[in-house]
Regions:
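Membrane-interface "cap" regions at the ends of multi-pass membrane proteins
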Residues: 1-49, 191-197, 215-225, 446-459
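Selective recognition of specific alpha-helical transmembrane segments in multi-pass small-molecule
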Residues: 32-35, 58-66, 101-110, 142, ...
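Transmembrane helix-loop boundary segments of multi-pass membrane transporters
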Residues: 43-54, 118-132, 148-157, 263-269, ...
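Helix-loop-helix connectors at the membrane interface of multi-pass transporters/channels
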Residues: 82-86, 113-130, 218, 292-323, ...
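Membrane-interface loop-to-helix entry segments
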Residues: 117, 130-172, 185-187, 228-232, ...
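Hydrophobic alpha-helical segments and their helix-loop junctions in multi-pass secondary transporters
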Residues: 126, 159-185, 199-207, 244-251, ...
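Loop-to-transmembrane helix boundary motifs in multi-pass membrane proteins
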Residues: 303-338, 385-405
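C-terminal membrane-solvent junction of multi-pass transporters and transport-like membrane proteins
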Residues: 358-438
Length: 459
């Protein structure tokens, strides 16, 4: 049952599946409590109900459109996402964004471990610490088993999530003043853009690993069907969760922040139903956190392989890498639980500054400059066309981060030009388009020798 492949090329003989598997994975993976908490932040931080929901949806669609373009690279090239960055940054140069991606995976996994640990503790009548440790052990097992098990988990998560969310929505709305919610409608540009940033950053954060879960699809699979499956799966799943978060925060007020799990479980009208909701929370977090653990294993493997010059990984190394990343997440979760909500908000928004220019460079290069042509064997050999470092791409990546800094409005970082946009954080828009335009306009300085068509390993 355990997956044999890691970051190496998936030959056509091992390809399988249908684009709809992407829908169930991203739909089910986003029906979970961290997305609920993120949606709630739009209200907790001052937004109204109506325009928070609209802003979240706008952000979902913007971020998911970019994310889905990354997903198309998986079936076309048969490789996980981050090793493809070597085509733009060089074999060693790709380590720069890879290290940041690993930090992101650890952060998301840690936040998920905090919330899942609370639910696991209630479900099994154990301490929060024990709940987090058991949850982390489950994540290790599933991440080691790999691709097929993760997709099966996504299908189950879709079913469990739909049932749990339908119940929670009905219970919440039956006890609420719907008229008051509908009239909670006072547009404010700062809080609207905050909602857009929350959801767009959520989606863009998936870009570094989305093709990890599409790379086994047949090479000739429909690009339109694949794009739509990822797009609608992640938008519908995340918007459902964030809508529940907005409504819950608006109804519960100060009773929700810091008590997210207990409040949602309180929607259960009996002990049995409360246990079902605890289970649904745990199951949803298992799916989502497994995506992060598997992605972190892929990224760490890509970093190590740059220096070892081989992409095949033994089962022992696979287990060791997964254990290392999950353990790091668990330790952070154990140390940061009391301040979870505050720190997670800052972390999620600040991540945009580092992943927006990476995404812009990768997509601009793949779709507009390389025209989808990648020399796959050269990705593992710095002596070939992609070299050790591509200073052109690395320089523009740094520029892409820097041009965002004056426009960032975040407790972790605040700069001087946010007044132009009434104190709103629009750095991600400036960073993505600015980096993409610069990368394309200055392409004559790129010294790579690009292939006329994709070159695949002999199998």
């Amino acid at each position: 049952m355990s997956e044999r492949r890691s970051i190496d090329y998936i030959p056509e003989s091992e390809r399988h599946g249908h684009p709809f598997s992407q829908f169930t994975l991203w739909f089910g993976g986003n029906l979970q409590i961290t997305a609920i908490v993120t949606g709630a932040l739009a209200v907790v931080l001052g937004g109204d109900v109506v325009w928070s929901l609209v802003g979240l949806l706008v952000g979902q669609m913007l971020g998911a459109a970019v994310m889905s373009l990354h997903a198309l690279q998986g079936p076309r090239l048969g490789l996980p996402q981050m090793i493809l960055s070597r085509a733009q940054f060089g074999v060693f140069g790709a380590v720069v964004p890879l290290v940041l991606v690993c930090v992101m995976y650890i952060g998301f996994s840690a936040s998920g471990t905090v919330l899942a640990g609370q639910a696991m503790a209630k479900l099994l009548n154990i301490s929060h610490v024990a709940g987090m440790l058991i949850f982390s052990a489950i994540i290790i097992v599933i991440a080691v088993l790999g691709y097929k098990v993760i997709h099966k988990l996504g299908k189950l998560a879709s079913i469990v999530g739909i049932l749990a969310f339908v119940y929670m929505f009905i219970t919440l709305l039956l006890s609420a003043d719907l008229s008051a919610l509908a009239h909670n409608n006072h547009f404010s540009l700062p809080t609207f853009l905050l909602a857009v940033s929350l959801s767009s950053s959520w989606q863009i954060a998936f870009c570094p690993y989305v093709s990890d879960y599409s790379r086994y699809l047949p090479r000739d699979v429909s690009a339109t069907k694949t794009w739509c499956s990822v797009f609608f799966g992640t938008v519908l799943g995340t918007q459902t969760s964030m809508t529940l978060g907005v409504l819950t925060a608006a109804i519960a007020g100060s009773a929700f922040p810091g008590h997210e799990v207990s409040y949602l479980v309180g929607l259960g009208k009996s002990q049995a139903m409360a246990m079902v909701i605890y289970f649904a929370i745990c199951f949803g977090k298992i799916t989502f956190t497994t995506l992060n653990a598997y992605g972190s294993f892929m990224s760490l493997t890509t970093i190590v392989s740059a220096f070892r010059r081989q992409t095949v990984l033994s089962q022992k190394c696979r287990i060791a890498f997964v254990v290392l990343m999950v353990t790091a997440s668990c330790i952070i979760a154990l140390l940061s639980e009391p301040a979870f909500l505050k720190h997670f908000t800052h972390f999620l928004l600040f991540l945009l500054a580092f992943f927006v220019p990476w995404s812009a460079i990768c997509l601009t290069d793949y779709y507009l400059i390389s025209k989808g042509a990648i020399d796959i064997p050269a990705l593992s050999d710095p002596q070939q066309r992609y070299g050790f470092w591509n200073l052109y791409a690395i320089t523009l990546y740094i520029v892409g981060v820097l041009i965002q800094l004056p426009f960032i409005e975040n407790p972790l970082f605040h700069d001087s030009l946010t007044w132009i946009f009434a104190g709103n954080d629009v750095s991600w828009i400036i960073g993505w388009f600015g980096t993409g335009v610069l990368y394309y306009a200055l392409r004559r300085f790129d010294r790579r020798s690009l292939p006329a068509q994709s070159l695949f390993p002999s199998t």
